[in-house]
């Protein structure tokens, strides 16, 4: 499974690890992804999503249906 948030589409970022002597080596900054079971009131069931922690906070504010519609995600297929 790829490390991508299912609602926001966030994925890894390419960055530099910079040492004290300022030598640069490339590193990958991964997204903090968590498996989350969310109650979907319209479908009357639980939906299991792989979300970034930022998406979990936004989900609490917006609600699942509005956030999924904005992301273009069909919850019936999950």
Swiss-Prot record:
Signal peptide: none annotated. GO terms for cellular component: ribonucleoprotein complex; ribosome. The keyword Translocase does not apply. It comes from the Bacteria. One of its GO terms (molecular function) is structural constituent of ribosome. One of its GO terms (biological process) is translation. Gene3D superfamilies: Ribosomal protein L28/L24 (2.30.170.40). Keywords: Ribonucleoprotein, Ribosomal protein. NCBIfam families: L28. Belongs to the bacterial ribosomal protein bL28 family. This is Large ribosomal subunit protein bL28. The lineage of its organism: Bacteria, Bacillati, Cyanobacteriota, Cyanophyceae, Acaryochloridales.
């Amino acid at each position: 499974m790829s490390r991508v948030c299912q609602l926001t589409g966030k994925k890894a970022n390419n960055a530099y690890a910079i040492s004290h002597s300022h030598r640069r080596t490339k590193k990958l900054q991964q997204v903090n992804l968590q498996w989350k079971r969310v109650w979907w009131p319209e479908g009357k069931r639980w939906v299991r999503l792989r979300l970034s922690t930022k998406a979990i906070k936004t989900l609490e504010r917006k609600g699942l249906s509005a956030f999924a519609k904005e992301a273009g995600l069909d919850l019936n297929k999950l």
